[in-house]
Design a protein with these regions (language model features):
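General beta-strand structural signal in soluble alpha/beta enzymes
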Residues: 7, 32-33, 71-72, 93-96, ...
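A glycine-rich beta-turn/hairpin centered on an aromatic-Pro dipeptide
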Residues: 325-347
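A conserved helix-loop-beta module that forms one wall/lid of the active-site cleft
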Residues: 94-156
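Internal nucleotide-binding/catalytic subdomain
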Residues: 156-303
Length: 347
C-alpha cells in the first residue's frame, strides 16, 4: 500500500514542506491542496483542487488516497478546527487543535496567556471601544504598535509613529469591523528572531528545536512600508556573534520555551487535548540582549520554512521521521539528535 502525505496550503511554505517530504524514501506521493505552480512541476508532488475550507471534502480525500499523515501549513484552517475534524474521523494530522491555535488566532488571548504565565512580552492594553483606545494613546510614548485581535495574514499589525497614525490604525482595525478587539502595545527595538519547534506536549513529550530564522515583513527597502506576511528570510540571523553571547541567548530562549511548555501543559488539563505540531515563538532581542516574546504562531513561518527545509536537507535529516513517525522511537539515539543551528541560508 502506498504511503502518501497530504499537505494543506498553497504558498512557498507548503511547497518547501512537500519538497522535503518528497525526498524521503518512506513516502510515495505528496498531495498538496491546492498547491501552486511550483508544486505542479515537482516529481512525486501532486496538486489537489479542493477548497481548503471544505473540511468534508478534505477528509474524504484523505480517507480515499492512502494518506498516512496530513500536515497543515496555514493558520486559518488550524483556527477553524481542521485538526479536530480529522481526529474525530480517525485520521492522523500534524497540527494543534483549535483549542491551542487560538494562541495565534487571538492576540488578546495570546497576550493574556503570556501575562498569566509570566512570559516576558511588551506592555499592552486591549480595547473594544474606539473612544477609549484613542484616549489611551494621547499620553503614550511613540512609536506604538496597534494590532488586530484576529488573523490578518501578517497585515493586522500597524506601527504608529505619532498620534495621528495611531488614530488611523485604530480606525482601520477597529471601526472597519476588521477586528472586534485591538491590542495596543509598546514598540520594541532590537533584532527579531523566530524560534520554531516540533512539539508533542503530552505523554511522551518532546520538542525539537529548528534553526533560528528571521523574516523581513516590511514591503519596501530599508524596513519601510506596510507589513506583509514576509518578503524574505535568513537562517542563523545573529551572524557569528561571540560564542559567550550566543550561549547566553540560547539559555534565555530556553527559559522562555520552558515557561511556554509549562503554560501549555497547564492548559492541557483544561482542554484534555494534545499539542502536536509546530510552535513558532517570535522574539525580540534588544541592545542589552534582553528577550521578549512578540507572538506565538502554531505553524511554520512563511517564508522561513524555505530556509528550514533546505537546512534539514543539507544535514540529511528526514522530515518524515520528525513529524510522521514518533521521533523518540523512530530516530536512533533520539536524545543525541542535533540539528546544526549555525548553517546559514536565505530566501
Amino acid at each position: 500500500m502506498d504511503q502518501n502525505i497530504f499537505v494543506i496550503g498553497q504558498g512557498g511554505r507548503e511547497h518547501a514542506i512537500a519538497w522535503k517530504l518528497s525526498k524521503s524514501n518512506k513516502v510515495d506521493n505528496v498531495y498538496v491542496c491546492p498547491g501552486n505552480g511550483g508544486t505542479s512541476l515537482e516529481e512525486n508532488i501532486i496538486n489537489v483542487d479542493i477548497n481548503i475550507e471544505d473540511k468534508d471534502s478534505l477528509i474524504n480525500f484523505a480517507k480515499n488516497n492512502n494518506i498516512i499523515m496530513t500536515i497543515v501549513g496555514p493558520e486559518g484552517p488550524l483556527v477553524d478546527g481542521i485538526v479536530n475534524s480529522f481526529i474525530e474521523n480517525g485520521l492522523k494530522i500534524f497540527g494543534p487543535t483549535k483549542e491551542y491555535a487560538i494562541l495565534e488566532g487571538s492576540k488578546v488571548f495570546s497576550k493574556e496567556f503570556m501575562e498569566k504565565f509570566d512570559i516576558p512580552t511588551s506592555s499592552f492594553r486591549m480595547f473594544s471601544d474606539n473612544i477609549e483606545a484613542k484616549n489611551y494613546i494621547k499620553n503614550k510614548k511613540y512609536p506604538i504598535v496597534v494590532k488586530a485581535d484576529g488573523l490578518a495574514a501578517g497585515k493586522g499589525v500597524i506601527i504608529s509613529n505619532d498620534e495621528d497614525e495611531a488614530i488611523n490604525a485604530i480606525d482601520k482595525l477597529l471601526d472597519s469591523n476588521h477586528s472586534e478587539y485591538i491590542v495596543i502595545e509598546d514598540f520594541l527595538i532590537g533584532q527579531e528572531l523566530s524560534a520554531i519547534y516540533i512539539c508533542n506536549f503530552k505523554g511522551a513529550s518532546y520538542e525539537i528545536g529548528l534553526p533560528w530564522t528571521k523574516d523581513y515583513k516590511s514591503r519596501d527597502e530599508f524596513n519601510s512600508g506596510p507589513n506583509t506576511g514576509g518578503m524574505g528570510a535568513v537562517s542563523h540571523p545573529l551572524g557569528y556573534q561571540h560564542k559567550n553571547l550566543l550561549f547566553k541567548l540560547h539559555l534565555e530562549i530556553e527559559k522562555i520555551l520552558i515557561k511556554t511548555i509549562a503554560a501549555i501543559n497547564n492548559y492541557n488539563k483544561k482542554t484534555n487535548k494534545n499539542y502536536l505540531g509546530f510552535l513558532y515563538i517570535g522574539l525580540m532581542i534588544n541592545n542589552d540582549n534582553d528577550i521578549k516574546v512578540l507572538e506565538y504562531n502554531c505553524r511554520l513561518g512563511d517564508p522561513e520554512t524555505q530556509n528550514l527545509m533546505l537546512t534539514l536537507e543539507n544535514q540529511n535529516i528526514d522530515l518524515y521521521d520528525l513529524i510522521v513517525n514518533d521521533p523518540i522511537n523512530s530516530i536512533k539515539d533520539f536524545n543525541l539528535l542535533k540539528i546544526d543551528t549555525e548553517e546559514s541560508s536565505y530566501c
